[in-house]
Amino acid sequence: MKVLALRHSVAQVYADTQIYTHDETKDDYENAFLISNLTTHNILYLNYSVKTLQILNKSGIAAIEIQKNDELFTLIRCNFTYDYIDDIVYLHDYSYYTNNEIRTDQHWVTKTNIEDYLLPGWKLMYVGYNGNDTRGHYNFSFKCQNAATDDDAIIEYIYSNELDFQNFILKKIKERMTTSLPIARLSNRVFRDKLFKTLVSDHSRVVNVGPRNESMFTFLDHPSIKQFSNGPYLVKDTIKLKQERWLGKRLSQFDIGQYKNMLNVLTTLYQYYDMYHEKPIIYMVGSAPSYWIHDVKQYSDLKFETWDPLDTPYSDLHHKELFYASDVTKLKDNSILYVDIRTDRENADWKTWRKIVEEQTANNLNIAYKYLSTGKAKVCCVKMTAMDLELPISAKLLHHPTTEIRSEFYLIMDIWDSKNTKRFIPKGVLYSYINNTITENVFIQQPFKLRTLRNEYVVALYALSNDFNNREDVVKLVNNQKNALITVRINNTFKDEPKVGFKDIYDWTFLPTDFETNESIITSYDGCLGMFGLSISLASKPTGNNHLFILSGTNKYFKLDQFANHMSISRRSHQIRFSESATSYSGYIFRDLSNNNFNLIGTNVENSVSGHVYNALIYYRYNYSFDLKRWIYLHSTNKASIEGGRYYEHAPIELIYACRSAREFAKLQDDLTVLRYSNEIENYINKVYSITYADDPNYFIGIKFKNIPYEYDVKVPHLTFGVLNISDSMVPDVVAILKKFKNELFRMDVTTSYTYMLSDEIYVANVSGVLSTYFKLYNAFYKEQITFGQSRMFIPHITLSFSNKRVVRIGSTRLNIDFIYLRKIKGDTVFDMTE
């Protein structure tokens, strides 16, 4: 959903678009709630309130002020992520249809021959960091840039077994045109940048679990963040390999040597960050022209000093000359060194060339050892070739993708590695490593152990659901880690599957009730965005690849109506009720019927069941940004911070009724997951609320009416407005509450319209218009620990006779209250009041 705020209506009609005019009779929160539950994708919001827009954005729903027609046309035709703090729109708009172009934000790609392999008539477009270079295309009242790129397809090609790039990219573009937009991938880059900048400024120690290559630029400016990954491939691990020969295989039609060099340097850099938590000087020997340095500098102020007879245009200090072992003394401490020396083969025969390569490998290794032999805070990455070698057993092996697999690989060493035990590694073993291993991640830090960290903020995005983690340990970490943002895969199967397959792995599945957290927000991706100053135009869809975002230790926990709130809670219900159901009131009717309340007259305005809880349960796959458990808990402890809106606090029994209705719904749908979720939420309600039932009552509240439009033979027909189980000493407390509610009780619009047999020989008249006040009264008694109401649903009625009678129907007739009283069952009236 996207909300585009206009000061006046537009003449043009757009598909999947609805107009909402601000309702001055309602406050900003109520307007925001009504907007959020509209069913179209585009909402044109007229006569808007800025406060309402703020409320929607905090809820993760993109809402933007529009000043020009161009702005409206641009935003209505594509999806986007909105930074509502800095007023920046990040479009996710592929431009195939306007410019026949493939988009990239990696500068090195533009310096390859990739255009030779694009579709006929197509070109490559460089858009800069998150589309920064496209800002000039949009002369808007807000900052706007198009962050959509095809880098995901380019990188997937590099790691795939496909060689024909044109066929590969054509297939990927067709996939993009026939499947839903990978909005999370596009939006996630914006989110990660914002997230870690915020966390580093707010927390002294941040830990990140499971980063992948898509985050390799995000952390360049955050050396203090401790990374945990899958660990490195060490020299000593080659002991498991059998010897092989040179294979030789082309991985890419266009030259990706620069990409390999970038990955090597970034892997080395993150090793340095892991050890020293600060930025080093980056020395590079060879590897010109290194256009990728431009990409790195978009994200960080890292300094590069380079040596190569060829130009390196983006280096801070370039020496256009060869580098020798004697030059190592020029290199300072607190640095990394990348050695990529290899002369061109030119016309040399194979044997001569092989001899040169082995000599250069020995020379490269000598430079590395010399660099690491003195000083402090140093890490080196050196180019190697498959040959008989003695190498430190703790050194890390790298084999990032390159244009052709031949005989080269890379070795990362720190000072300690260079002095560690060395082992002889035969050439054939190194060929086996090269032929069968592609390094897939620049993050090669040690794996994360599933244990609580006392002083750190833990971030684990899409990293802990894998079934090689112990599920109980994951739950324990979420429950006990005081400061964290952790995601786990949500269980949106229908058979309550404990794990689901994803790509070539299996993930555990989770529901919010799997966790026991009292100070954590459990929400969706879009709900999480709102807490970090972002909103999105396309909400999460129940694809099977959805995650719960669990934020622990956030200062937004008590702000119940501002973040992870009830916005859009009825949206899925509206979509179904107005397009597929037998009646638009089907939800209300089902909730009443499933709790044995058969008086459906006015059910849409007088309902016994919490619609919020019911919708949050049965449609949780469509909207789990609403943190239901937090909502229940904060109300149960009376700690909810409510900023505005027509906010109705439910009585705990209404929540129980909702769970029962959801359970009935789940059985009809054969939805085992909702069935379990409903049971567990009901158990949670009973846990946090101390609900007691007056199933053996000794007092009741009665309402006597001035007029009863039916024949009756009981002595005093009345409405039993709830029963109590109290001691005589509590009577004054009950009376005090009744007096407090006096005006509201006498203002009730009480009506009746038919009679019916409640059971055999109990003839009653229906009563409407009292449920809302009944549940408010229930809440007041609950807060004073007064037992009021029974476990079965309260069905308001007036007993007319204790014999079987014929059902009577009349027009809706108002019942005027004569007086209200408190009486002991089989005893005397102890209190009464009149208007």
From Swiss-Prot:
Keywords: GTP-binding, Host-virus interaction, Hydrolase, Inhibition of host innate immune response by virus, Methyltransferase, mRNA capping, mRNA processing, Multifunctional enzyme, Nucleotide-binding, Nucleotidyltransferase, RNA-binding, S-adenosyl-L-methionine, Transferase, Viral immunoevasion, Virion
Residue ranges of coiled coil: none
Ranges for region GTase/RTPase activity: 556-692
InterPro entries: VP3_Rotav (IPR011181)
Region (N7-methyltransferase activity): 171-245, 429-555
Keyword check for Transport: no
Region (2'-O-methyltransferase activity): 246-428
Molecular function, one GO term: mRNA guanylyltransferase activity
This enzyme's EC code(s): 3.1.4.-, 2.7.7.50, 2.1.1.56
Annotated catalytic residues: 718, 720, 797, 799
Primary site of residence: virion
PROSITE patterns hit by this protein: SAM_MT56_VP3
GO terms of biological process kind: symbiont-mediated suppression of host innate immune response; viral process
Catalysed reactions, semicolon-separated: a 5'-end diphospho-ribonucleoside in mRNA + GTP + H(+) = a 5'-end (5'-triphosphoguanosine)-ribonucleoside in mRNA + diphosphate; a 5'-end (5'-triphosphoguanosine)-ribonucleoside in mRNA + S-adenosyl-L-methionine = a 5'-end (N(7)-methyl 5'-triphosphoguanosine)-ribonucleoside in mRNA + S-adenosyl-L-homocysteine; 5'-triphosphoadenylyl-(2'->5')-adenylyl-(2'->5')-adenosine + 2 H2O = 2 AMP + ATP + 2 H(+)
HAMAP family, alphabetized: Rota_VP3 (MF_04124), Rota_VP3_A (MF_04128)
Family (UniProt): Belongs to the rotavirus VP3 family.
Subunit structure: Interacts with VP1. Interacts with VP2.
Chain's role: Multifunctional enzyme involved in mRNA capping. Catalyzes the formation of the 5' cap structure on the viral plus-strand transcripts. Specifically binds to GTP and displays guanylyltransferase and methyltransferase activities. Has affinity for ssRNA but not for dsRNA. Capping activity is non-specific and caps RNAs that initiate with either a G or an A residue. Together with VP1 polymerase, forms a VP1-VP3 complex positioned near the channels situated at each of the five-fold vertices of the core.
Record note on domains: Contains a bipartite N7-methyltransferase domain, a 2'-O-methyltransferase domain and a GTase/RTPase domain. The C-terminus contains a phosphodiesterase domain that degrades the 5'-triphosphorylated, 2'-5' linked adenylate oligomers produced by the host cell in response to IFN stimulation.
Record-given protein name: Protein VP3
Source organism per UniProt: Rotavirus A (strain RVA/Cow/France/RF/1975/G6P6[1])
Phylogenetic classification of the source organism: Viruses, Riboviria, Orthornavirae, Duplornaviricota, Resentoviricetes
